[in-house]
């Protein structure tokens, strides 16, 4: 016992020293700015900090590739499908078409005897259409429905403590005695909805799968996740490959689709190699129910800065599994399609909410670094502090008073994006990943200031994203973007003012003209490809029936 505590203390000290040393090392490399390669007049340079970031991308891609090889080998591993599984669907003001597609995909799941529990966040007349769709798709004679005036934590109007207890027991009994059931309950947020499903199921099943109401599941998605949990008893949770259902509806959804692929099949695949996936996404995830009930109350009652948390449910659920020392995995063999915002403002609000939960959960996650591979510490430091280094770099380049610095920065952003997207295209076997380089512009212009705004408002709670039937009227997310653009515009004006004081040399003019032409041609080429792709694939998608997940 004493030996285990001593080893635990050593691991805590070791991971802490490693993380601090890594951060100090990166900071020192950034400040010193040592250059390996440097041309005359400083038109191009490649330094220690750049070499470190390049090495990170190469190493991350390598481990992702190795994890994908392991996934392919697991196909040959036979398993017995004798474990009980329950699918929990969280619904809130869902688009009827998306909800219908979600439930139709649920009916096509190949895992035998899977139980379906859909909980609707809201019990007003405006929410009844979701229950009607559930009964229509799942079969009125094969499913049950129940309108609950309250939920597990709040009593209904005029309800006593005793009657609230009885209604809670009734809901639990309905869930346990029906293979398919839909419950409408008093509004309380997504975490309240998920809690109802977890609490009502109790320990009656072996594995619990989570799903959002805008998600279409691949028929084999449940089977593939069960395989991962069955192969290793120390794996506590597993997530699948989330693809975009409405990728051709707008430019924002299209860029999100290529970003999703990169996030899951490179970043999370790499994390999975070391058994420390940071977030099992809500649209497609599965947990050991025995673990779930060790922390479900703590998960629901999570507080941050004195306020109860109402967003970041999936990320905190994953962190709770990691806190127990269990591994979390990713499998590309389990797939789904999900809706993503097609409007810029809704997307910005979504990204701000996700960034809030990321930074909050980063602090919580840090307490468990010592229980997992050093890669978990390493990646947390790199991804957690990268935005700050990037902002410092951008401001520094824009206010140095040299037009070439700004142009070089724009070219470098696209070059790095192109290198990453080229590797992703090879791994995926699809040229569409080349558009990932366009997402880098969206990251620099919008996501970067959204991250800073998320930190500044991290204790502000709420559902985070309005229902799909609601028009977005919250424009506050545009404030940080406007401030960021003002800062960049100030840098451009300052640079033009400084450069106008002295004439350009002939060599400088040549470099600027060539750089501008390369940048302009790059954009013309990609935008042309985008228009061609949208016209070709957009028409094909209109008549397509989503009987299975297609990687297009």
UniProtKB/Swiss-Prot annotation:
Disruption phenotype: Embryonic lethal. At day 9.5 dpc, the distribution of homozygous embryos approaches Mendelian frequency while only occasional viable embryos were found at 10.5 dpc. Embryos exhibited growth retardation, scant numbers of red blood cells, and lacked vitelline vessels in the yolk sac. The visceral endoderm and mesoderm forming the yolk sac was not fused except at discrete foci. The heart was thinwalled and relatively bloodless, and often exhibited marked pericardial swelling. The heart lacks cardiac jelly, endocardial cushions and trabeculae. The chain crosses the membrane at residues 12-32, 46-66, 375-395, 403-423, 430-450, 476-496, 511-531. Glycans are attached at residue 221. InterPro entries: Glyco_trans_2-like, Nucleotide-diphossugar_trans. Expressed in heart, brain, spleen, lung and skeletal muscle. It catalyses: [hyaluronan](n) + UDP-N-acetyl-alpha-D-glucosamine = N-acetyl-beta-D-glucosaminyl-(1->4)-[hyaluronan](n) + UDP + H(+); N-acetyl-beta-D-glucosaminyl-(1->4)-[hyaluronan](n) + UDP-alpha-D-glucuronate = [hyaluronan](n+1) + UDP + H(+). GO terms for molecular function: hyaluronan synthase activity; identical protein binding. Gene3D superfamilies: Spore Coat Polysaccharide Biosynthesis Protein SpsA, Chain A. Its EC number is 2.4.1.212. It is an enzyme of class 2 (transferase). It comes from the Eukaryota. Its cofactor is Mg(2+). It is found in: Cell membrane; Endoplasmic reticulum membrane; Vesicle; Golgi apparatus membrane. One of its GO terms (cellular component) is cytoplasm. Pathway: Glycan biosynthesis; hyaluronan biosynthesis. The modification Phosphothreonine is found at residues 110, 328. Keywords: Cell membrane, Endoplasmic reticulum, Glycoprotein, Glycosyltransferase, Golgi apparatus, Isopeptide bond, Lysosome, Membrane, Phosphoprotein, Transferase, Transmembrane, Transmembrane helix, Ubl conjugation. Belongs to the NodC/HAS family. Homodimer; dimerization promotes enzymatic activity. Forms heterodimer with HAS3. Forms heterodimer with HAS1. This is Hyaluronan synthase 2. It comes from Mus musculus (Mouse). The lineage of its organism: Eukaryota, Metazoa, Chordata, Craniata, Vertebrata. The gene is Has2.
């Amino acid at each position: 016992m004493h030996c285990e505590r001593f080893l635990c203390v050593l691991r805590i000290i070791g991971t802490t020293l490693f993380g601090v040393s890594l951060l100090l090392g990166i900071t020192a490399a950034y400040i010193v700015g040592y250059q390996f390669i440097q041309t005359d007049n400083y038109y191009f340079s490649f330094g220690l900090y750049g070499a470190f970031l390049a090495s990170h991308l190469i190493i991350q891609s390598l481990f992702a590739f190795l994890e994908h090889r392991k996934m392919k080998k697991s196909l040959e591993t036979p398993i017995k499908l004798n474990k009980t599984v329950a699918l929990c669907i969280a619904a809130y003001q869902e688009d009827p078409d998306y909800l219908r597609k979600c439930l139709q995909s649920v009916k096509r799941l190949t895992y035998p005897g899977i139980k379906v529990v859909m909980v609707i966040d809201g019990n007003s007349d405006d929410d009844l259409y979701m229950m009607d769709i559930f009964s229509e798709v799942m079969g009125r004679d094969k499913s049950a429905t129940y309108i609950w005036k309250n939920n597990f934590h709040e009593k209904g109007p005029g309800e006593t403590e005793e009657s609230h207890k009885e209604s809670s027991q009734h809901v639990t009994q309905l869930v346990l005695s029906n293979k398919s059931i839909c419950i409408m309950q008093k509004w309380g947020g997504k975490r309240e909805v998920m809690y109802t499903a977890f609490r009502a199921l109790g320990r009656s099943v072996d594995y619990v799968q989570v799903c959002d109401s805008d998600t279409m599941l691949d028929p084999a998605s449940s089977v593939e996740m069960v395989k991962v949990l069955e192969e290793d008893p120390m794996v506590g949770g597993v997530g699948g490959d989330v693809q975009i259902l409405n990728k051709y509806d707008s430019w924002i959804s299209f860029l999100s689709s290529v970003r999703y692929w990169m996030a899951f099949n490179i970043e999370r695949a790499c994390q999975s190699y070391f058994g420390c996936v940071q977030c099992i996404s809500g649209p497609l995830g599965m947990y050991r129910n025995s673990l779930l009930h060790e922390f479900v109350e703590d998960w629901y009652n999570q507080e941050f800065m004195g306020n109860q948390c109402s967003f970041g449910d999936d990320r905190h659920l994953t962190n709770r599994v990691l806190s127990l020392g269990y591994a979390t995995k990713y499998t590309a063999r389990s797939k789904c399609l999900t809706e993503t915002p097609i409007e810029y403002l809704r997307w910005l609000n979504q990204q701000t909410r996700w960034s809030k939960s990321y930074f909050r959960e980063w602090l919580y996650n840090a307490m468990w670094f010592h229980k997992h591979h050093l890669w978990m510490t390493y990646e947390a430091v790199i991804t957690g502090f990268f935005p700050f280094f990037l902002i410092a770099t951008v401001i520094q380049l824009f206010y140095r008073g040299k037009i070439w610095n700004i142009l070089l920065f724009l070219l470098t952003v696209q070059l790095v994006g192109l290198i990453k997207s080229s590797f992703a295209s090879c791994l995926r076997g699809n040229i569409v990943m080349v558009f990932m380089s366009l997402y880098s512009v969206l990251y620099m212009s919008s996501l970067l200031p959204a991250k800073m705004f998320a930190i500044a408002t991290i204790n502000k709670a709420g559902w985070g994203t309005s229902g799909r039937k609601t028009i977005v009227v919250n424009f506050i997310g545009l404030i940080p973007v406007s401030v960021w653009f003002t800062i960049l515009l100030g840098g451009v004006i300052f640079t033009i003012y400084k450069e106008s004081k002295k004439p350009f040399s002939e060599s400088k003019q040549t470099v600027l003209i060539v750089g501008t032409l390369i940048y302009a041609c790059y954009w013309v080429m990609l935008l042309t490809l985008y228009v061609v792709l949208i016209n070709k694939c957009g028409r094909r998608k209109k008549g397509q029936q989503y009987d299975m997940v297609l990687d297009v």
